[in-house]
Structure formats: structure tokens, C-alpha cells
Amino acid sequence: MKVLLIHSDYLEFEAKQKTKIAEDTDILNGKMEECLTVFMAVEKEDEENPQNVIYNTVDEIIKTAENLKINNVVVYPYAHLSSELSSPKVAKEVLQKIEEELKQKNYSVLRAPFGWYKSFKISCKGHPLSELSRKITTERKEEKGETEAKDRPKNKFYILDGEKGEEGLKELDEKKVKKLKDKGLKSVAMHEMGIKHGGKEKDIEPPHVKFITEKEICDYEPSSDAGHFRWYPKGKLIRDLLQDYVYNMVVENNGMPVETPVMYDLGNKAIKEHADKFGERQYRFKQGNKDLMLRFAACFGQFMMKKDMYILPKHLPLKLYELSTYSFRYEQRGELVGLKRLRGFTMPDMHTVCKDTKQTIEEFENQFWMCLKTGDDLNTPYSTIFRFTEDFFEENKEWFFKVAKEYKEKYGKDVILELIPERKHYWVGKVDMAVIDSFGRPIENPTVQIDVESAKRFNIVVHDGNEKTYPVILHCSPTGSIERVLCGLLEKASLDADAGAPPMLPVWLSPIQARVIPVADAHSEYALSVAKKLRENGIRADFDDREESVGKKIRNAGKDWVPFVIVIGDKEVENNILTTTIREKSTLKKPVKENLTVEELIEKIKEETKGFPYRPLSLPLYCSLQPIFR
């Protein structure tokens, strides 16, 4: 069942003409005000268990209506939501039953007739939750009041002081969470435990959304689907550098880069089972007689590749890596937020085949530290949450406490632990790391997951003599999506500005690392020679030759977050020195300047960027020739 839920000022329809499958009805027109309009398409797969589809659809409608605090519901058959429709007989029965169930629960219901050509008018309220789409399956959901749901143990959350080992493990509840001193862990715990955040409202635009356009990094592409971006030269450079950074890190850790398709056939049983575990937030479509999907991660291609490999124990741990350009998730339109939540994104994705539990936890630990290093390198400190099933935790808790202790020793931070009574997902353990945004909310980035299910599903085997075994597979994204990395960097820059520091990106990621500004025309020749020499030495520099005052040029360099701004006048030309404002050492109120030779400046920038990837600047050397994208 596909449904589209619209919070409406009103819905008005008129049945115009019967089709061959039209139901007989006296209700040929109708209008309802202040309502939830539910457009529905009953699908072929719903015929397997129509009762569960009815139950789940009614449950979804009621949840939405309660959130919106409305009691009027319009049930509107709308075949255009799906290309795989059920038989007319089943569709009529399902829609009628949904109407009856809602009425029994004291909702006022208007149902448009099935099988008629209808005209309709609708007015959508236009708030973030006013347009929602859902894919309803035949899998039965349970009511809150059902015994099974009541008896099922809930996940438990703990805070762990790694220095104290098991004695440092304290269970969390809402009261204790709100008293946590570590703002990052408090934010993560509140988010995971469903505790209402007391900060700024969700619909306020986060600072990074302004930055991405203001700094000519990227912007929404209006001619594409919502949540897809176009990247300008500066943004493309930043993204490419981040991709190079992850590539180098993975290869240094023995990962083997591969490339796989973005599109997969849902007729493959393993592909469909894996895709179905991620719910309805997918791009699916029909081409000829094939049902296809766009990938939401690189799992599909890598697993199919591993299935065809002849893997021996000596090959393990075996790591395949792909930068999935692109991955796709059909997030709800009202949930799309800049680079934090979007529909098309770039995901570094590594999958490691492990021999046994010992090798699995060794690799998990190695990849945990690798992920943490990305936070160090990007200067975006992470808050960390571990999640384990209770069985896995009990079997491996000594190892976990050892890792938590080492983490505390290095970073001085506690961790959150979530214990899950029974395995619900493909993994038995994972670690997630988050950057905290300007509103105090987590941006989930790196992750490592212990997958005990996919090897069997995709028939990935390790050949050991005459035996074939299904290995454990680690999923790892060392940084999280490239877009979210940039989101975290920009949100941190906003927090830095709030604290009085000039916002900036790390020097190795700054599109323009140095800008040379002449005071007057007489200084231009020397200033230009400096800019050229910087470029010749692998520094992304430009030369501000625009017809503007020196003050405005300096302000523009500040707006562009240029880390090193060199102003050249008489003194600089005569003494062969560069008066350089160093952004990282400055405050918003007081710039810090140093007198450097060209060689000293080059050495300084080289030292700042040592060990990080480099790409040249594609923009012209002369600022006057650089095109304006925004």
C-alpha cells in the first residue's frame, strides 16, 4: 500500500464518470474541511495479507491524525501512486474496511468512490509535517496494549566512565540525562531516548544552510528532485579533497577500492530482502518488467562481488571500499535539511570480511580508532555511542571496557552504551559518532557495524578445506557521508563564531588558502609575483585586483574565510616581507598579524597541511576574473 497524507484546509471532489471497475455508490461528491486527506493505492503485494495492510494503514493514519490533532479523515483512492496495483476487488474491500475501522475509532470519515474519474480541489497547509508519504507493508505491527509488546523488554541506556570499568556504568533515565555535563553526550542521549529537546525549534534553518550558498559551496538544484544539490567549483574542491582523504586513509588500512552500480534489480531475492530492511525510504521504479531501486549504500554491489569471490582464511580480514557516488534515500520532504538530511549523497563505505569473533573485535577496534582520527583531523570532536545486543555484550564486555578505558585516557570523555535485549537488525553491535550542531543536536557521521546476517543472505562464504563458513562482515564509514562531514564542519564554524573566533575550514580544505591584496597599483606587480609564487609552490592563492578599497578587499577575504590574508604596501615591497593576517590565531575583534617572508609563509602553510591531500584551485588567479555563482 502506498499512501500520501496531506494535512488539508479542505478537500472537495466530484465523481464525473464511471470506469469498468467502478463501485456502485450514491456519494458522487463531497467536501471535508480541516482534515487529513489520505490518497491511497492498494498494491499487488497487499493481496498476500489484506487484513494486516488494513490494520497498519489505519494505525499510520491515526498516528498522523493524533500528531496533527485532527479528527476528520478523507480516504481517497489514487491509483497513480503505484505501478503495481492490486485487483479492483481487493482494493475496494481494503478501502471500505479502512473507512469502517476509522469510523469505529470515532473518526469522521469521507471516502471518495473507487473506480470513478473524479475532479478534486485541495488546499495543503504547507507546514513541515503537512505532506507525508508512506509505504505500508503486510508485516503486522503491534498495538501498544498488546501483551507481547508489553512484555517485550526495552532497550536500556547507560553512561560509562571508562576509567572505572564496569563500576563506571550507570543506567540513564530522563532525569539523569538532563543532568549530564557533557553537552555532546547529553544531546546524543536525548536524541536516542526520545527526550524532547529544549533548544531551538526544528523548523529554524541551521547556519550551514546559509553558509553553503553564501560561500558558493553548493545549493539545491531546482530542476531535480528535492534534496539534490549542485556543487560549485569551491564546493567541488572541498568535496574532492574529503574524498581523497578517506581514500588515502582506507588504502593505508589495506582497503581495496572497487566500483559498483548505483541501480539494482529487486527480482534478486537477496537484494530485495536487504532493501526491505530499510523500509520505504528508497527510490524504486519499474523499467520494462523489472522492479529496480537506486542504492542507499554500497552494500549491494560489494556483497554481490564478494559472493563471486573465492575467499580463503589467509585473505582475511578482506576489505573492499567504495565511495558511493551517489547513494539515494527518499527522505520525507519536510525532513530535508541542507546537507544534514538530503536524498542524494556521497557515502564512503567499506565492508570487511572477518574470520571469527576474535578477528571481528580486533578489526572493529582498529576501525573505531580510524573513525576517531577523522574527528581529530577535521577538528570536529565526536560524541560516541556504542550499541550491543545483550548477548554480544555479555560475551565481550571485558574487551568493551578496555576500549572505553583507552578512549577515556586519550579523549577524556565518557561514552553512551545502548543495550538491546534481542537482535532486531542485521548487526549485533555498532558504534556511532556524532558532531553536535549549532542547535545542540547530533549529526551522525562515522559508524562501524558488526553484521551477522548478510553473508548468509548473499551466500558469501569462506573456503577452509572442505568446509564453507559464513563470515562476519563489518560495515564502516570512516567519516559518514561527505555531505554530513561538510555540514559538521560548517556547524562547528558557526559555533566558533558564537564563541568569538573567526569561522573557517581547516587550511587543507580551504578552497582559497591565501589571498594577496595590493594597497595601490604601485604594489600590484610585487603582489602578483607573490601570488604566483604561492601557486607555484602548491598553495591555493589568488590576487585581488578588483577596483575596490583595501578595506573592502580585506572584508571580502574575511567573508571568504581565507586563512592567510597578505596586504602589500610600500613597507612590504621595500623590505621584501609579507604582512599576513592569520585567521586561526585571530579573534573576531582582534586580527593577529605576522611579518613573514614568502618562503616562511609557504613553509607555514605546508606545515599546516602536512599529511593531507592537495588539489589545485580551478578558479582564476585574478579575483576580477572569478565568476560569480550566487
UniProtKB/Swiss-Prot annotation:
GO terms for biological process: threonyl-tRNA aminoacylation. Zn(2+) binds at residues 299, 351, 475. It is found in: Cytoplasm. The keyword Ligase applies. It is an enzyme of class 6 (ligase). GO terms for molecular function: ATP binding; threonine-tRNA ligase activity; tRNA binding; zinc ion binding. Catalyzes the attachment of threonine to tRNA(Thr) in a two-step reaction: L-threonine is first activated by ATP to form Thr-AMP and then transferred to the acceptor end of tRNA(Thr). Also edits incorrectly charged L-seryl-tRNA(Thr). This is Threonine--tRNA ligase. The gene is thrS.
